[in-house]
Amino acid sequence: APEIWFLGQVGAVILLFNSGLESDLKLFLKYSKQATIVAIGGMALPFILGLAVMVSFGYSDNFTDTQAIFMGTVLTATSIGITVRVLNELKKLGSPDGITVLGAAVLDDVLGILLLTIVVGMTASTENLTLIDISIIIVKTLGFWLGLTIIGRLLSGHISKLFVKFHSNGSLLVLSLSLAFISSGVAEFFGLAMIIGAFSIGIALSGSELAKKIEKPMHGISAIFVPIFFVTTGMLVDLTTIASYWEFGAILTIAGIIGKVFGSGVAGLLAGFKPKDSLKIGVGMLPRGEVALIMAAIGIASGALTQNLYGAVIMMTFITTLLAPIILAYLYKTDK
């Protein structure tokens, strides 16, 4: 039903706005060098493997095909929320490898959402895109994200002071969510993925007094709308297609695991971490969670993903999200 789909989209905006709010930019800047190396490694290998799987299974003719690029983009996703919860429960959020994973996950999401927005722009075009067209989409996407983040960051103190005058946390939440929805609407107006607006304004407001004030009510509203988003993504899955295309789903899942664990893990070694800590970093970057689901939902809505490819993405997301906390807990428990 259109109403449920609309509520699901509201849930997606709230989810990404919250992810942005929870992104600690100061922490990221402290370990920015290591986090950047890990994020690049954790994006490059999954992206290449995503392209390779699509071409080898015959879903795409070449590596420049939009569907192949979209699948590669989905494989780059890392869930900040799941990674934070796991490291928090293990009391390892403040450790060097924990902070690096968190910083890399933030950068991973920023780059992944930028990449997604570029691919959506490519999909929206009915004509064959030239290099100039693609360059325009990239410049537009980067310009929008940087512009919104910088303006938001510069104004976050003023916005926070203005909003905090409303003593009711409920009023603060309504005003903050209004900003998220307006930013999403502006992104859509420019032909970009709406989630880039919500995520960017969330990052801009992260660490502010306002972010602290709306933390509790944000969890309350998330508990209402976010499950609706997960229900709508589940409703789009045709279980018969998963059963029919399980081989592709299995290979995509293996590519997703190898891409993150090896890509981020080897990058961790290059960043100066010990082998076991590098493995923890690789596994910490593994869960795809809500980020991949949002990307997949946008993919099916924009026509970049077919039903059977969507089912394979859901399978890969579910398995990687399930495996990561178990393996990470085991790796930390076996520390001397």
Label every model-predicted segment.
Residues 1-336:
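Transmembrane helical cores of multi-pass secondary ion antiporters/exchangers
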